[in-house]
């Protein structure tokens, strides 16, 4: 019978399910579990699995907390080949007010993927209310 396992939320290693301290990195698993949900979502932006990051991006966009804008932009820049993730970040940032607009401007200038740069630039123009912001193009999803 296989031993029950869990994934450490700090180092993402597989560890025994009954552990309270990660044997790999020493993280206090009880303290990590008790963290605020926003803190957990921000930590998930560093997760090695793209679907975990994507869920965090979507949730952070829906929560609309401007203080998460830079962390979202950093996530997109850490994973430059994941264009779908980058576009999701652009959409999430569009819900974060001025902080989101600043992060969008950073992506528009610095993201390696042209599609993400273009989407960030278009979203920046739309948020400013620019009448020439290519109205025939749909905003990124």
Residue ranges and their predicted role:
Residues 3-7, 23, 32-44, 65-78, ...:
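Amphipathic alpha-helical scaffolding segments comprising HEAT/armadillo-like alpha-solenoid repeats
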């Amino acid at each position: 019978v296989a031993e029950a396992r869990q994934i450490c939320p700090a180092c993402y290693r597989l560890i025994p399910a009954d552990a309270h301290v990660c044997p790999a990195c020493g993280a206090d698993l009880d303290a990590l579990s008790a963290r605020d949900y926003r803190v957990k979502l921000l930590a998930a932006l560093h997760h090695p699995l793209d679907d975990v990051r994507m869920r965090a991006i979507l949730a952070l966009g829906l929560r609309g907390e401007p203080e998460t804008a830079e962390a979202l932009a950093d996530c997109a820049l850490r994973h430059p080949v994941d264009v779908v993730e980058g576009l999701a970040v652009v959409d999430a940032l569009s819900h974060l007010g001025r902080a989101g607009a600043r992060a969008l401007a950073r992506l528009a200038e610095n993201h390696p993927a042209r599609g993400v740069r273009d989407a960030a630039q278009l979203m920046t123009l739309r948020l400013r209310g620019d009448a020439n912001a290519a109205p025939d193009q749909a905003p990124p999803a």
